[in-house]
Regions:
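Cofactor-pocket helix-loop regions in the catalytic cores of large enzyme subunits
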Residues: 1-180
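Conserved small/polar residues in nucleotide/adenosyl-binding loops
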Residues: 183-185
Length: 185
């Protein structure tokens, strides 16, 4: 599902950032993963960025995990509501004009279609579906928008669903909206 979702969004089915990119991140967003237990080496890299760059760590997971215990912002959402969560975050990004307009203009095709879909996911609707309060969504969106370059990490918790392809595409669209994709720091 990752390869198909990324290929459909970016045009090729591969991830973009390395551990060295993570070291230079000013914000870190993790969804569908628990590096503390599943990828301890990657957690060391995340913690290095958190400590050296004062990078806020945002962890989105239905369960409070060992990784979530390290988070500056833990977002508990209903299982399977990843797309609604991401669209809710993007609603705040577009509503507050936090998107990277120049990056979108130069490198992104179809963001107007994404924007039209995201308009349906205001704070009330997103909270109804995900269980996440609109105030927390706005806070998380603002953290990611104000701390660039950032890192967005997803793992099999988001991809191993019947809607995993949709999750992956939403994750990619979020990165494109903020200009986080394809940035080599």
């Amino acid at each position: 599902t990752t390869v198909a979702g990324v290929a459909n969004t970016w045009g090729y089915g591969a991830m973009t950032n390395s551990y060295n990119d993570i070291h230079n991140s000013k914000a870190i967003f993790v969804i569908g993963g628990n590096p503390a237990e599943a990828h301890p080496v990657s957690l060391m890299h995340l913690m290095k960025a958190k400590e050296q760059n004062n990078a806020p760590l945002i962890v989105c997971d239905p369960r409070f995990t060992r990784t979530a215990a390290h988070a500056d912002e833990y977002v508990r959402f209903r299982p399977g509501s990843d797309v609604a969560l991401i669209w809710g975050l993007m609603w705040h990004i577009f509503e507050n004009k936090w998107e990277d307009k120049e990056f979108i203009r130069q490198r992104v095709y179809g963001m107007d279609d994404v924007r039209a879909e995201v308009k349906k996911w205001g704070p009330e609707e997103t909270e109804r579906v995900t269980g996440v309060p609109g105030s927390q969504l706005k806070r998380v969106a603002k953290i990611m928008a104000n701390n660039r370059p950032g890192t967005f990490i997803w793992c099999m918790g988001g991809t191993q669903h019947t809607n995993g392809n949709n999750n992956t595409r939403a994750y990619c669209a979020f990165q494109l909206a903020l200009g986080l994709s394809l940035i080599h720091i």
